[in-house]
Amino acid sequence: MNNQGRSILAWATLFIFVILLFNVFQSDSLLGGRNNITFSDFLTRVDEKTVNSVKIQGRVIEGTSNDGSTFNTYAPDYPDLVNRLTSNDVNIEVVPLETRMNTFLGFLISWFPMLLLIGVWVFFMRQMHGGGKAMGFGKSKARLLSDKGPKITFKDVAGIDEAKEELTEIVDFLRDPSKFQKLGGKIPKGCLLIGPPGTGKTLLAKAIAGEANVPFFSISGSDFVEMFVGVGASRVRDMFEQGKRNAPCIIFIDEIDAVGRHRGIGMGGGNDEREQTLNQMLVEMDGFEANEGVVIIAATNRPDVLDRALLRPGRFDRQIAVANPDINGREQILKVHLKKIKYNSTVLARIIARGTPGFSGAELANLVNEAALIAARLGKKEVDMHDMEEAKDKVLMGVARRSIAMSEKEKRLTAYHEGGHALVGLYCPAASPIHKATIIPRGNALGMVQRLPETDEYSQNREQMESSIAVYMAGRVAEEIIFGRNKVTSGASSDIKGATNIARAMVTKAGLSDLIGPIFHGSSGDDMYGRQPNNETSEATAELIDAEVKRIITQGYEFAKDILTKHIDQLHTLANALIEYETLSGQQIKNLLSGRALDSEEENKFPFNDSSTIKIDKEKSPEKTKTTKAKKENYAS
C-alpha cells in the first residue's frame, strides 16, 4: 500500500474509533438506552403499585415494572421519595455514582487525551519520515534513481555540445577508469553546472544517470536543512555514507545555492543551521577521509552567491557553463522536441531557430508544445508552420487580445505609432531586420513591432546602439508628427525606458561617451543580500552622465524625426495598411513601400538608393559584432 493509502486508512481508523467511543458514552449515558418517562408518570405508577423495583444512582432512577418492562426517569430534589416507594412495596437498590462506570472505560476516559496526542504525534512523524522511522530526522533524503520508467540519454540532449563533452568524460571514467588512470589522471571530485534557468542543467544530470551504469543519487539543496538543529549536517554525513557504500556512484545536488551560500551572513549573530550544513559538506567533499569513487554533480543559476571554499578545486574541480543555445543549438533542440509531435513539411526548424534568439531549451520545448495545442484547438491533424508562428508570437509578445474593442481613433494612433517604429527600423543603417508589425493587442501592449537579427549577436557597436535608440523613439515621434505635440500619448513609456537603458549603458558601461570617457560607473551587480551596493560615482559625474544620456536620446529622437518627416507618405501608406490588415510581415512591409504586390516573394532590397535619407547597404555598413545576449526586441505601443 502506498503512503497516500496508509494516510487515508489511518485517518479512517481514528475517525471510526472516535465514533465508537461516542456511541459508548451515548449508550452508557445516564439517560440513554431505555424507555424514558416523566417523574409525574413515575409517581403515578408507584401509587398504582405497578412498579416492582427501582435502582437509584444520584438523581437517575432505573425502574422495572411488574410486567418486566424497564424505564428511566430523572428525579428532582424530593425528600419523601424513599418513603413513598417503601409505602407502595417497591424494592429499592441504591448504586454509588462512581461505580457506574466500568474500570476499562474509566481508564480510557482518563487517558484518552494523552493517548490521542501521542497517536497524532506518531502519525505525523511517520508521514514526515516514512515507514516507522520516527527518529530518522538525520537520514539523507537522497533518492536512488530507479531503472524503471523512461530513460534519458545524451541523445536527448541537444544544443549544449561543450557541456555534454565535459560530462561524457566523467561517465567514461566511471565506466572504464583504467583508460585515464594509466596516464596518472584522477576522476574529478565534483562538477558544477552553471547557467540561467531552462538551459538544461537538470536534463544533463538525467542524461548522466541514463548513460552511467553506476548508482545515481539525486537530492535538492533545500532537502538538507530542517527545523531541528544539526539535522542538515547529519543528512550530509548520511548521504556521503550512502555514496561510499555504493561507490563508484554519482550524487546530484540540484539548486545547491539553497545550502551553499556565503558563510558569515547569518542574521542576528546566532549560529546558522545552514552554515553548519555547508561546513559538513565542505569536510565530506575534501576532508581527511577519502571519497574515492563518489562524484558530486551540482547545478545552480546563482554561482555568485556560492561560498568560495565550495568552488575551489578539490571540491568542484570543474565549472561547466550551460548557456542559452546559439542558432545551431536551437535548431538541434527544436528537432529533438519536434520528434514528439505530428507536423508536416512546412515546419522548418532552421527558420524557427532564427526567429527565437535568446530562447533557452525549456522555452523552445514550451514553444513546440504551444504549437501542438494551437493545432489541436483548431482541429488540425498535423502542426504546420502557421501554428509555430502563432505559438512564437504568443511566447514573444503575449496572447492576442482580440476581444478588446478599440475605437477607430485608438486604432489609427496605434497604427501610426507602430508604423513609425517599422519605417525608422528599415532606414536605420545598423538596425536588425523587421520581422513583423501588428496592431493586434498582445499582452499589455496595443501593438508591437518585432525585430530579429539575422544571426546571433553577442555584442553591439555604437552604430547599432544608436540605431536601436532611434527605432525606440520613432513611435513617439510619429505620434507627434501626425497628431501634434499635445496629442502624444503615454503608449511610448516602455519605448522611452528601453531607449534610456541603452543610452545609460553606452555612457556608464560601454565607455561610448566622449565626455565621460571609457570609465565604468555604477554597480557591478547585486550583493549577497540581493541589494544594490553603494554607487561610488560623484554627484558632479552623475550630473554629466544624466546630461550625456539626455543628449544621446535627443539625438536619436531627432534622427527618427528626420526620417519620418522626409518619408511621411510612406508612413501614411504603412499605417493605412496596418489598419486594414492588422498584421504585416517584414517582407510585406518592404513590398508595400516599394510598390510591389503585398505577398510578392521577389528579392526586395528596400530601401532604395535615395540620397535624401540614409542608404542601407549591408555590405558597406560597419560589420556587425555580436550582442551580449541574443536579443528579442519588441516595441510596444
UniProtKB/Swiss-Prot annotation:
Residues 28-103 are periplasmic. Its main location: membrane. The keyword Calcium does not apply. Its cofactor is Zn(2+). Pfam families: AAA, AAA_lid_3, FtsH_ext, Peptidase_M41. Zn(2+) binds at H417, H421, D495. Keywords: ATP-binding, Cell inner membrane, Cell membrane, Hydrolase, Membrane, Metal-binding, Metalloprotease, Nucleotide-binding, Protease, Transmembrane, Transmembrane helix, Zinc. It comes from Rickettsia conorii (strain ATCC VR-613 / Malish 7). The lineage of its organism: Bacteria, Pseudomonadati, Pseudomonadota, Alphaproteobacteria, Rickettsiales. The keyword Transport does not apply. Residues 603-637 are annotated as: Disordered. This is ATP-dependent zinc metalloprotease FtsH. Coiled coil: none annotated. Homohexamer. Residues 1-6, 125-637 are cytoplasmic. Acts as a processive, ATP-dependent zinc metallopeptidase for both cytoplasmic and membrane proteins. Plays a role in the quality control of integral membrane proteins. InterPro entries: AAA+_ATPase (IPR003593), AAA_lid_3 (IPR041569), ATPase_AAA_core (IPR003959), ATPase_AAA_CS (IPR003960), FtsH (IPR005936), P-loop_NTPase (IPR027417), Pept_M41_FtsH_extracell (IPR011546), Peptidase_M41 (IPR000642).
